């Protein structure tokens, strides 16, 4: 009897596992052949699910962004909730920014603004912040958080508040 494969689940699993490989090696250091080897699948199997490296990166972004959730702190103030979210983002911030800048290298501002992976990432982070502070304050709060994380990373404190 043939093996029944849930293609959507398998595709999501491949993307999630490939995301860590992108983080470790950077966008420029990844090839479809290397990812296929890392995942233990043939290159043709990988291409069956993802026709290009950019399509794979987009799928990885979508899967990783599903895990962006607001830490639950019932009764906590908005400030405490934003601090908890910032702290939750801190451990992977440096590697995520390095990967992101590698991915964006050579793209124009217009290309970046139209890039689906960037839109997915920004929307997920914006939604998480808006859940805490509301839509009106979300963009400014997110910008403050990203600045805080960046300065914290440069200071070697992982953006902790």
PLM region spans:
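Amphipathic alpha-helical segments used for helix-helix packing
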Residues: 90-119
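Helix-turn-helix
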Residues: 2, 10-13, 17-55, 59
């Amino acid at each position: 009897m043939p093996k029944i494969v849930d293609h959507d689940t398998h595709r999501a699993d491949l993307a999630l596992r490939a995301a860590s490989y992108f983080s470790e090696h950077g966008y420029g250091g990844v090839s479809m052949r290397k990812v296929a080897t890392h995942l233990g699948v043939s290159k043709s199997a990988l291409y069956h699910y993802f026709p290009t490296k950019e399509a794979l990166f987009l799928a990885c972004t979508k899967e990783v962004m599903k895990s962006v959730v607001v830490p639950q702190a019932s009764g906590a103030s908005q400030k405490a909730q934003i601090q908890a979210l910032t702290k939750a983002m801190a451990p992977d911030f440096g590697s995520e920014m390095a990967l992101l800048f590698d991915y964006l290298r050579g793209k124009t501002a217009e290309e970046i603004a139209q890039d689906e992976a960037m839109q997915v990432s920004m929307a997920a982070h914006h939604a998480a912040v808006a859940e805490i502070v509301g839509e009106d304050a979300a963009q400014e709060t997110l910008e403050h958080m990203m600045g805080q994380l960046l300065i914290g990373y440069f200071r070697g404190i992982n953006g902790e508040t």
